[in-house]
A protein has these predicted regions:
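Intrinsic-disorder/low-complexity linker and hinge segments
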Residues: 27-29
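N-terminal export signals
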Residues: 1, 7-25
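Divalent metal-dependent phosphoesterase catalytic cores across multiple superfamilies
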Residues: 31-214
């Protein structure tokens, strides 16, 4: 349904930084800092399923992340929930394919590690039958050193006035160039120099670049 970088609530997701101490990881690490620094996101909906995502920032070896999906923003009616174990092998990302949802319905979702909680995201499943029309926002080519990232705020502002059904990213969500690469002439002045400063080659390079964009 929706993927975005920071502020969305309806078709995209919201972000916040929550930090605290919680027991996780190994027996030798009784309490470690945990935070949700990369927000939450949802996407790839069907009539009965949707994927929800987040990333945990921590020094632990692994983290058990609880997740909930509810029909109301107060989470008085939780319809699906579970626990997802994430670790360094997946860069502490959490990706859950939530199933057995109702068609054409809005849902709220969140993630928790102990008492620490992510921001609440909002998503929607597809309708059962065809629709006569749909409203969408389309974005593409998000080059960190030169991209017009304020467009995401503008989409949110427009959405609050006239809701979009979907936000569609056509591609080039990140660019792998290093410092001095394509369209990076003003990167230093804008405070948007690419992470690491070199072209992305390794898996770790790409993980850091995606984290920088988000």
């Amino acid at each position: 349904m929706s993927l975005s970088r920071r502020d969305f609530m309806k078709v995209v997701s919201s972000t916040a930084v929550a930090t605290g101490l919680i027991g996780c990881g190994s027996d030798d690490n009784e309490s470690v800092a945990v935070s949700f620094e990369h927000g939450v996101a949802s996407g790839d909906p069907t009539q009965t399923q949707v994927i929800i995502w987040t990333r945990v920032t921590t020094a632990a070896s692994y983290v058990d992340v609880s997740w909930q999906v509810a029909s109301d923003i107060e989470f008085l009616n939780v319809v699906q929930s579970g626990v997802f174990t994430t670790d360094t092998g997946r860069d502490f990302t959490v990706k859950v394919d939530v199933q057995n949802l109702n068609a054409n319905s809005q849902y709220y979702y969140r993630f928790m590690v102990g008492e620490m909680m992510s921001e609440v995201g909002q998503t929607q499943t597809l309708p059962e039958d065809g629709v006569e029309k749909a409203s969408m926002a389309v974005v593409s080519c998000a080059n960190y050193p030169a991209g017009y990232f304020h467009v995401y705020r503008e989409i949110l502002n427009q959405h609050e006035q006239s809701p979009f059904d979907v936000v569609l990213h056509l591609g080039d969500y990140i660019y792998e160039y290093g410092a001095g690469g394509y369209a990076s002439e003003d990167a230093a002045a804008l405070g948007r120099e690419p992470s690491k400063g070199t072209e992305c080659i390794t898996l770790d390079d790409y993980r850091k670049r995606y984290a920088q964009y988000r």
